[in-house]
Design a protein with these regions (language model features):
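Alpha-helical membrane insertion/targeting regions
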Residues: 1-223
Length: 223
């Protein structure tokens, strides 16, 4: 009994960690959505969202389920037991990821820079937002060609970039505790570090296995 349960429990270590990593950004996003829905005092930090709420609302409504559903795709035993759910969730995950990436780029290009942002962070947002979008497009192309291993690799890359906000909480926290509020240059480094760390971990996961499991099952047309 214990030997059978051990691998099953270990299957949930990574998904649990990823969900935990999503909690702070998800809570912050929920607070933002509540402010926009109910109204809040307009400040320099939020006035751009009230002036043009559509991109941030679409982004938050898609990036939160993207992070949560994506985490469950890393539980092999769960995928095997719930293949139909896995297939359907994969479609939702793909749609959410595309909208999240597109709206991230939209916000970067359309919103005025908040205090603390600068050219370096602006370029980082464009680069990693574009990389996430490209990864998702490549994942779609791979699944249409029934290249399941390639599909899995591209989805891992897209998910890693999409989870950048969670890792950025961890890169910022020590700086806040030891130094204080970061200036423009420090903020760019800390934000960039979150994306780079995630991208590095994604490549490590991919290279660790020569045949990574596809995160999303093929569509009915290709199954």
């Amino acid at each position: 009994m214990a030997s059978r349960m051990g691998p099953r429990r270990s299957d949930w270590a990574l998904p649990t960690g990823l969900i935990a990593l999503s909690v702070v950004p998800a809570l912050a996003g929920t607070v933002r959505l509540t402010e926009l829905a109910r109204g809040a005092v307009i400040t320099a930090a939020n006035e751009r969202f009230f002036a043009m709420p559509l991109p941030v609302v679409l982004h938050l409504l898609t990036v939160i389920p993207f992070s949560m559903l994506g985490a469950l795709q890393f539980a092999p035993s769960f995928r095997e037991r719930h293949r139909m759910w896995h297939r359907r969730a994969g479609r939702v995950l793909m749609a959410c990821g595309l909208i999240a990436a597109l709206t991230a780029l939209w916000m970067t290009l359309a919103y005025p820079w908040p205090v603390g942002d600068g050219e370096a962070l602006y370029l980082e947002r464009l680069v990693f937002g574009s990389a996430m979008l490209l990864s998702l497009v490549m994942a779609i192309d791979a699944i249409r060609r029934r290249k399941f291993a390639a599909h899995g690799r591209w989805m891992i890359r897209a998910y890693a970039i999409g989870m950048g906000a969670g890792t950025q909480v961890l890169t910022h926290l020590p700086y806040y505790l030891l130094v204080g509020r970061p200036d423009e240059s420090s903020r760019a480094v800390l934000m960039g570090a979150g994306w780079v760390i995630n991208a590095g971990v994604a490549e490590w996961i991919i290279r660790r296995s020569s045949t990574p499991r596809a995160m999303v099952f093929p569509t009915p047309a290709s199954s």
